[in-house]
Amino acid sequence: MESIGNILYSIINEIGKEKIQTTITLNVTVSREYIQMIIDRFNGLVNLTDENVGSLCEALLHFMLTTRTLPSVRKVTIEKMNLDVVIPNLHTLKDFPEKAIIIQIVKDSQGITEDQQRNITIIQPNVNNIWVVTKEPVSGNYVNYTAECGNEKSTSQRRNFHDILVDIDAFLEKTNDRSFRFFH
C-alpha cells in the first residue's frame, strides 16, 4: 500500500499544487474547500482509521502552512513533551504564550491523555490556544478540530479541520504577528 504522504501528494498534484498555492495565497478562506476536497478524495482511496486520518491531517497541515507561508515550528520537544506544531515560533510560545498556538495531531481514538493535557498546559496555559486534531470529536480542555465528515456544526471548542488554516491566519492577524514569511 502507498504511504499516506504519497497518496496526499498525488491528490494535490491532480488538483494542481501551484493552483492551490496561488488561490489560498490570494484568499485563505478557499483553503476550506481544498482541505475538504483532499480529505474527500483521500476517503475514497484509503481506509479512514484514526492513524490514517491523523497522518493525513498532519501532512496536509504541513503542506498548507508551507503553501500559505504561515510561520510554524514542527516536531519539537519542550519540557519532555513532543509537540506536533507550534504557531508562530518557540520564542513567542515561551515569552508570550497568549500569542502562540500548540497543535497536537492525535493518531488514535483516545484524544490526548490527562497527563499530556497537564504537561501541555504547563507550556501553554491558555487552553484556547491548545488545538487538538482528531478523526472524531473527543472531549478535553482544548479546542478540538475534527476531520469527521458531516461535522458542519462548529463551536468555539469544537471545529472542523477544514477551518484550521483560516483560524490560524485569523489568530496571527489578531495577535499582530510579524514573523518573517517566505513568499513564492
Per-segment meaning from a language model:
Residues E51, H62-D84:
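A short acidic/basic microdomain associated with nuclease active sites
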Residues L48-T49, L70-R74, V86-L93, Q116-I120:
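Short secondary-structure capping micro-motifs at structural edges
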Residues E33-I35, L45-D50, H62-T67, L90-K94:
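A broad, low-specificity signal for short, low-complexity segments enriched in glycine/proline
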Residues N6-N13, D40, G44, F63, ...:
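Charged/polar, solvent-exposed surface patches and flexible loops
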Residues L65, L83-Q116:
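Conserved catalytic cores of phosphodiester-cleaving nucleases, focusing on short active-site segments
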Residues I105-H184:
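Charged, structured surface patches that assemble and position nucleic-acid processing machinery
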Residues M1-L56:
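Interdomain/boundary linker segments immediately adjacent to catalytic/signaling cores
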